[in-house]
């Protein structure tokens, strides 16, 4: 069909509409998917939507946004990235708490978001209970939680859980779904 007929661009085509419908069914959430070209773009768009330039983003010291994305998240969001040392690539409330200061002080970056990778860059996986503990703490401090789901299908398989059970049900605010590493030909979705 795509090579034989005309389709409107900019999301007004049957393929985009079908993808949006499937995403909403999968997550059973009122969400507005944004399709982007690659993982860095997905993370940057997600973090831009969640933060303001005077804020900071907390992440594991091994996190993709800190180690591998060539400073794009810092450049595009204006936020400071605050790496947190972890023994296994996973953040915990106990590891996050020491970074929860400076709120209301114009001389300090205000913690605005927590970034998680599922699976982590070290191959570890967050359980729903671990995710809920992090999102609860973050939300208590008015912060949002972003999940980089470049390899989330592996976490779903390892834990035998659905995408919804590892995101929406755990309080994750924004997911960057990695299409390429999760079985699609190309592209990502916020």
Annotate each PLM feature.
Residues 1-190:
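Conserved PLP-enzyme active-site core in the AAT-like
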């Amino acid at each position: 069909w795509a090579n034989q007929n005309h389709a409107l661009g900019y999301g007004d085509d049957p393929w985009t509409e079908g993808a949006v419908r499937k995403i909403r069914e999968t997550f059973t959430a009122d969400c507005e998917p944004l399709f982007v070209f690659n993982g860095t773009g997905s993370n940057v768009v997600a973090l831009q939507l969640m933060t303001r330039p005077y804020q900071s983003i907390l992440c594991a010291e091994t996190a993709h946004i800190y180690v591998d994305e060539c400073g794009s998240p810092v450049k595009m969001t204006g936020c400071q990235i605050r790496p947190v040392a972890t023994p296994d690539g996973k953040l915990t409330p106990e590891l996050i708490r020491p970074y929860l200061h400076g709120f209301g002080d114009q001389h300090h970056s205000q913690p605005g978001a927590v970034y998680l990778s599922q699976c982590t860059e070290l191959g570890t996986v967050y359980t729903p209970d671990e995710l809920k503990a992090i999102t609860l703490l973050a939300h208590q401090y008015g912060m949002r939680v972003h999940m980089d789901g470049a390899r989330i299908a592996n976490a779903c398989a390892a834990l035998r859980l659905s995408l919804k059970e590892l995101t929406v049900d755990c309080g994750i605010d924004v997911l960057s779904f990695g299409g390429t590493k999760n079985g699609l030909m190309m592209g990502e979705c916020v």
